[in-house]
Amino acid sequence: MNLISKNKITFIFLFSIFLLPAYGANKDTKAIYELIERVTPGYSSQYRLEIIAPDNGVDVYEVDGNGKEIILRGNTPVALATAFNWYLKYTCQAHVSWFGNQLNLPEKLPQPRERERRVINGRYRVYMNYCTVSYTAAWWDWERWQKELDFMAMNSVNMPLFTIGLDAVWYNTLLHFNFSDREARAFLAGPGHAAWQWMQNLQSYGGPLPKSVIDLSLIHI
């Protein structure tokens, strides 16, 4: 399996944490331990992650301590990541954002002052739109995508826009209506302008769309 394929599989696994409840505790906590280590290298061993039940069907998280470890609890991986972000903000006075991080953390992390329990507002926390994918994300590599996925989870997002494979849907629909391969790809906009194609504002701009891009989108699914 080549590196690109491994990255695709990892992308799908991480993306799936936004959509599924936490049934496999070990797998789900492992994903968030890895997130913690990416955001704050060297600190993941100071945390203990626990899966808890939802609060009357609503996502919930807790931040607690036992004198030795920082205890993060949540009913989903996203809830656990949200607890991690809350702890960084309000106990460590740290900050993680798109434009820069303030992560001046002591070697030994401080204990929370008291147990904090919070319900996450909204069953579905939606993020991104078509334009996001073409303005910036069309050119992201795996490292940048992983950073964005971590940021989404830490900010409670559980329903990001998922456009992977949409190019293939358009392409195969056009073939169904007797477009040739060349005609179909010429009709489709290039990756940097796909959003406006999907919103039916333009066609063909920046194209023809390479078949390799269409095939790549199918591998992601």
Show which residues each predicted segment covers.
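Feature activates predominantly on carbohydrate-active enzymes
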Residues: 34-35, 41, 52-56, 65-219
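Hydrophobic h-region of N-terminal signal peptides that target proteins for export
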Residues: 15-23
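Bacterial N-terminal signal peptides that target proteins for export
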Residues: 2-11
